[in-house]
Amino acid sequence: MPFGNTHNKFKLNYKPQEEYPDLSKHNNHMAKVLTPDLYNKLRDKETPSGFTLDDVIQTGVDNPGHPFIMTVGCVAGDEESYTVFKDLFDPIIQDRHGGYKPTDKHKTDLNHENLKGGDDLDPNYVLSSRVRTGRSIKGYTLPPHCSRGERRAVEKLSVEALNSLTGEFKGKYYPLKSMTEQEQQQLIDDHFLFDKPVSPLLLASGMARDWPDARGIWHNDNKSFLVWVNEEDHLRVISMEKGGNMKEVFRRFCVGLQKIEEIFKKAGHPFMWNEHLGYVLTCPSNLGTGLRGGVHVKLANLSKHPKFEEILTRLRLQKRGTGGVDTAAVGAVFDISNADRLGSSEVEQVQLVVDGVKLMVEMEKKLEKGQSIDDMIPAQK
């Protein structure tokens, strides 16, 4: 849990090697980068709001990692964390985001008209389509570090902004603390709401403190545009619907997101963004667009094909189970999404999903007929 700075000063009574964490069994990006020398160099630094190196790395110390999935192992507590602890974050970002260098510039493109196609994914295979991102509000610390008052202020500001939306975006806010257990579970099962904070990554980073205080979900009247408030990020903005019309999902995502951004700007609270990291978020894995464009797609034959993993890698896509990270695929339904976040734009990332899923559905249809797909295996994108 994040402590006051006085505790960090107290730790300096001990030598760096006495405070250096045991990372011998760890498989995460932080553990690869954090040498005793780097720990020594950064351990007495803190951001203006008092976030320290130990706060940054705690979640990665407590969660050594997954044998197959390389977790990041660190979080930012405020916008300045990425600058004050850049000697740790930069190599992690480079490692995680395909060699993205400290001098590289990120590009943003939220013009939905630049997406080609996307309205023709076969609904017999593509069951639902979803695009999400995160946003952080400038002037507040991030969920691993914020105080109760700060979190409530973020909620108040967000609800005022969201409640002023009109037309297809008119909706209502539902605070977590006024929901019954059943209502909450129903929303989780329908993939509308974030899970209760049982994830060790959330718990160890301090993001679940004071749960469910100042957390909630806002959605428009037909539940196709949702905003989570104060989970892992200040805001998670989601556009989703049943079927395969990714073009429409992306249109709604871009238009709604830009409306929200305008309202926050007018209120004097723009979103955290810079030209190197793009949109600044709590977890380094989400920097850049913060975007995950995903579909639930049925791939009964392709998923058994020996080249399934290789095809995904070549298309720059990743698969998750039906219920998201760490879940199994139910009935051969996979959650397929873009692997990249940083260094390419929103349009480019969703384009990869649209084109890649279309190709995979064509492959699936060929395999159903007992035909070979060897001539369809794509080159590396």
Swiss-Prot record:
It is found in: Cytoplasm. ATP binds at residues 128-132, 191, 236, 292, 320-325, 335. Residues 125-367 form the Phosphagen kinase C-terminal domain. It comes from Mus musculus. GO terms for molecular function: ATP binding; creatine kinase activity. Dimer of identical or non-identical chains, which can be either B (brain type) or M (muscle type). With MM being the major form in skeletal muscle and myocardium, MB existing in myocardium, and BB existing in many tissues, especially brain. One of its GO terms (biological process) is response to heat. Keywords: ATP-binding, Cytoplasm, Kinase, Nucleotide-binding, Phosphoprotein, Transferase. The modification Phosphothreonine is found at T166, T180, T313, T322. Reversibly catalyzes the transfer of phosphate between ATP and various phosphogens (e.g. creatine phosphate). Creatine kinase isoenzymes play a central role in energy transduction in tissues with large, fluctuating energy demands, such as skeletal muscle, heart, brain and spermatozoa. Residues 11-98 form the Phosphagen kinase N-terminal domain. This is Creatine kinase M-type. The modification Phosphoserine is found at S164, S178, S199, S372. It catalyses: creatine + ATP = N-phosphocreatine + ADP + H(+). Pfam families: ATP-gua_Ptrans (PF00217), ATP-gua_PtransN (PF02807).
